[in-house]
Amino acid sequence: MNMEFKRKMPTPQAVKDMYPISADLAEQKKETDRALRDIFLGTSERLALIIGPCSADREDAVLEYICRLREVQERVKDKILIVPRVYTNKPRTTGDGYKGMLHQPDPNSSPDMLKGLIAIRKLHIRVLEQTGFSCADEMLYPENHHYLSDVLSYVAVGARSVENQLHRLTASGLDIPVGMKNPTGGNLSVMINSITAAQHPHTFVYSSWEVQSKGNPLAHAILRGLANKHGRSVPNYHYEDLQLLCELYDQSGLQNPAVVVDTNHSNSGKHWEEQPRIAKEILHSTRHSAQIGRLVKGLMIESYLEDGCQKPDGGVYGKSITDPCLGWKKTERLIYELADLR
């Protein structure tokens, strides 16, 4: 094989034993799990707001950001359930660039997967301890989910991963909401097929075990826009797009029809400052169609302490080193506006 086997990684249980969570923290996570479950089952009318940096690059800045979210959550708790994005591993379009804290716990140092694995678990635990939030992360590497399974309340499967067999089958074995993004080319039938696979039981190999999943009734759609054959961004958050997804769900017979709409990526044409307008348009659509209102369970927004983005060695505290994000002032104002619209 054309690779070097550098070292054997500790098992998920070994890492959990080294960095455990208390019974109180476990119960806090369960409370968030129950609240999210109610939203995706339709027994709660609150909006799930999955919001945070494109990538969790620095522990101190991420913690400060999420502490600010906690204060806002208390003011909007009757209308919105905030689930912070703590994305610790990043897919890269060409494979180049910063791949997240899992790969590089220090963005300016060489990759160290063992240190990264420990760093991401410690970060999620610190967030839970200091804010009470259990968070969302992307399931980029399915077999790594078990390292964080006791601290995550939401998982997204990205546009480049959604057709992958192991991602789909692993999603079928989780007991939290899993959002399946439409692929970068925008084919919604691919996304619907992924949700179908995730909602059904399967037997497969996971972490050197033969496992039997039960199926995940909380698997759902994420609309993130698409790139057409010319490479141009095309949004899929408009009223007619949501109406089409309602029809696809009706035809599919899937459990608990639901969508979370990503306001950035191809939906914004990578113009991050458009996210507030897009988010408000989506909520207006929910008010004009009862069917769309039932379907839309949440929004996904990329936000950090500072507007925009910088290079990994840029040095601006709280500014994204991957995709550009909304800064805090715009974020806070937007959350209150969304609560008023809800």
PLM segments and residue spans:
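N- or domain-start disorder-to-order transition segments that initiate the globular core
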Residues: M1-T43
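Active-site-facing alpha/beta catalytic cores
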Residues: R7, I66, K79-L244, H265-S266, ...
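Conserved phosphate/anionic-ligand binding catalytic regions in large, soluble enzymes, centered on
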Residues: A48-A61, D323
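Conserved, mostly hydrophobic/aromatic
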Residues: G52, V261, G327
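Short acidic, Gly/Ser-rich segments with clustered Asp/Glu that frequently serve as metal-coordination loops
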Residues: C54-D57, N256, N264-K270
